[in-house]
């Protein structure tokens, strides 16, 4: 794990054994000492390799009848996934009591292999209070619903005429404040986050006010319909993909960590690493946790229907054995940590006249997305964009966009742009916000962004260009240059290299979809680097793998067996200037027989794809 650049691992230990710490029995309150010992030793091993740990304190826990908590006892029900007891966690004292009991027992426990309590170990870099749960999410028993309704009626006596959302928000915020204070009393020193999905602007605001950092979970093409079917859509053909919703979740002045992310196992998965690297770097996010490295779901767990249990890379969420993911993981990690792609030059914050308004819900932190004229639709592909909430301090942005407000609000401040609420029933002009922001940026002499309606989104740094019509991303920085997507029959000119699939090398078939990158390994610009990693990966699948097309145009994945088959990416890499040699690399990173590129005019050309590898090491040719 450390060799490929992993430096943070997330654990969710509060699940039933053998997959978690909770021992069998009528209650979920007993920790299995043997399983705790395994966790302790794994934490020690990670620490030895310089890998930090993120610990969830409430994630998979399913309360049991003996716990005395009035909540749904099953993870899956008609309302979807109910983790942590669902909304009941935030208003049932018994649920809070059990939560704190588990936290105290785990965090004050001394790891025998490190000789440190978890509250004292600096390797535990961050904690999450709750996973994917809010009082705004579904999943209550009928008696639980009546209890919550009664609490709301009591609240109305002192808050007449106020919305139910305000009551829910206040209730949840009080829980997070008291729970965070309790964890500090236990001795937790690391940053603490609330949850990792934003359930609308009220929930986003309370996370900003209470949490030390903001977190978000997000997936592309996640299985649906019995957790077996997915759409086989390339994100590169969709404007912004999931990075728009991630940008909505990020908050000005707060660290931002993506605690779950994946592009699931469709044939376009090779786009995942470089796309994510590009826009996490542009947005200046602080970390990406892929879910997951390798899962331990087993037959009969309910998840084996779509995870696969036959070997190969059949688990949809796992990346460990998937060449489309792991062939690029190391370079993406290195480039992210070293800052090979620059953060955006322009910082834009989005604030809300009223976080409880329909405007905030529809054009800002909507639970399931936002309207086409939201500032988060196109701007995150070109500038740095954050949400901003009253009461949460943050540095001044280049431009503050306020959603909603009285006509004329913000007049006299060129750095504040107020977007008034459209009239009810009015047609939505999806370019309205984009147009207004671009005009204001021009007035402020900020870096130019793409014109409204363009299908190619260029970052204000000039390093990224995402052509959503063609489905191609190019990265063009001094230390990393790449092309991702539908590159077949295209010649893509970058600053130091040309990635050429328009010329047919030796009559070989061209790839339809691939990711090709050249990354400096020694930290020098590619023009001077003595070690350049060339990576080329297209499709990969297991032997015998089946994708069954469904009646809705979606697909079901049926895992195959080892060995995994990798499509050769046949093309040409062209450059001018100094002479380089190329070493194809084995799967272990060892050099094979050197290749001398061909001369072409004043430059050289390396034909790739016939060497049985996804990696080449380019080094100066010292023999000339």
Model feature map: region roles:
Residues 589-596:
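Surface-exposed loop/edge segments in extracytoplasmic proteins
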Residues 222-232, 547-554:
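Flexible internal linker/loop segments at domain or repeat junctions
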Residues 602-624:
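C-terminal beta-strand-rich structural cap/linker in extracellular carbohydrate-active enzymes
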Residues 135-138, 223-225, 542-544:
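Short, solvent-exposed loop/turn elements at domain surfaces
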Residues 46, 175-191, 199-221, 230-394:
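Catalytic-core region of carbohydrate-active enzymes that cleave or remodel glycosidic bonds
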Residues 111-113, 121, 467, 586, ...:
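Acidic/polar residues at beta-strand termini and the immediately following turn/coil
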Residues 1-211:
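Active-site mouth of glycoside hydrolases
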Residues 327, 333-334, 338-584, 601:
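Long, low-hydrophobicity ectodomains and other hydrophilic envelope-associated domains
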